[in-house]
Amino acid sequence: MKKWISTLLIASTLVGCNSGSDETVSKTNDQKGEEQQVQKTEVVFWHAMSGDLEKALNEIVADFNASQSTIEVKPVFQGTYEEALTKFNAVAGTKDSPTLMQTFEIGTKYMIESGKIEPVQKFIDEEGYDVSQWEKNIVNYYTVNGTIYSMPFNSSTPVLIYNKDAFKEAGLDPEKPPMTYSELKAAAKQLTKDGKYGFSILNYGWFFEQMLAVQGGLYVNEENGRKGEATEVAFNGKEGLRVFELIYDMYNEGTFYNVGQNWDDMRAAFQSGKMAMYLDSSAGVRTIVDSAPFQVGVSYLPIPDDVERQGVIIGGASLWLMKDVDEEKKKAAWEFMKYVTTPEVQAKWHVNTGYFAVNPSAYDLPIVKEQWEKYPQLMVTVNQLKETKATPATQGALISIFPQARQKIVSAMESLYQGVDPKEALERAANEINRELEMAKKR
């Protein structure tokens, strides 16, 4: 009997031990399952969007993260485009490198030459992804020798913005904005009075590039650096001279307001009635319409008389994949990029920011049509882009020293207000930028 009881006790103990062991194994398996469920591929995304733009971007990222369970995109603000590029230089190729990075359009040549990026063309080819759904006049900028290097994201172009109320007061038709230089000069004369000016351009190199390209003028040789390595500038021909002469003449006639280099100052001057017409980015149209205490009109970039309109170059930025990161992360980033370019996401992006939709199908969605009914000015910006002819001029120039070049142009523009002859100012900028190009070749 005692033996039987002892056996029973031992058996009970063993059962108890086995029961606890099974429970432990079960819990461990559950924990592993949970870990497998929550483990996602992380995509660190560096960007330069701030304020309302960052809010709109974060909404897109949050929606993507919630739409699937395998990828987690982490947006990280890195300051201005220039600041972000400086930080990229410090970490590219290291474990601290992001997977995805937003870089401004003039950084294209630099990024390609860095050797640290993976062209999105790789994933386009592997998947047979249809890029015809993307706006060709935007994609063209980031296409070099048939390879699409980055995915267009926030793109804009320049437009003429004008005060319709001021037009009426001056006896001008508010529905017929100036389309040529002679019309611009004539309208500016009628609009200039009582300390208020007819026209202004921000002292910013981008606007010079645009006024050059709309005429078909090239910024540098070798077909704007698209056929081969650019070795010297080409902007100091008749097209560039026309731009400088326009500014010089209007300033000396007293119809042009020197607004400086600050975007906020420029927009504030327009809203206060200091000038009746100026050039701005298409991305700023809605904000201007909302904040101006008068009716705002938007039109195409004016061109010289008797010159055929070629179109505009896109500005803004694109998304770049890093080369030296895990393939899994690159594929995850590509999934996010595809999501971003869907019509639904692009429609929301266009409505919330004013940037163009990379996927034009977005313009057919109700959310955009409703926005255009409220802001018909946005349609003008889209139409100007659609009507742009694909040429080396409108593709934009490819040079690695673009930031420096822009500053040289700014200095040249400012010298016009000091009485420097337009041709002399243009040649001085050309010589300085040619030296920069020569130095870049030696690095």
Q: Model-found features: residue ranges?
A:
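Short, low-complexity disordered leader/linker segments with a strong preference
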Residues: 1-44, 66, 424-427, 431-443
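Short, well-ordered beta-strand elements
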Residues: 38-50, 71-76, 99-100, 149, ...
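Short, polar/charged alpha-helical segment
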Residues: 50-72, 409
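Extracytoplasmic "Venus flytrap"/periplasmic binding protein-like
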Residues: 63-134, 169-171, 269, 276-277, ...
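Extracytoplasmic/periplasmic substrate-recognition and gating elements
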Residues: 66-67, 72-74, 89, 170, ...
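Hinge/lid segment of periplasmic solute-binding proteins
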Residues: 104-162, 185, 201, 209-214, ...
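Glycine-centered hinge/linker elements that transmit conformational signals in sensory
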Residues: 187-190, 229-259
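C-terminal capping/gating helix-and-loop segments adjacent to ligand/active sites or protein-protein/ligand interfaces
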Residues: 377-432
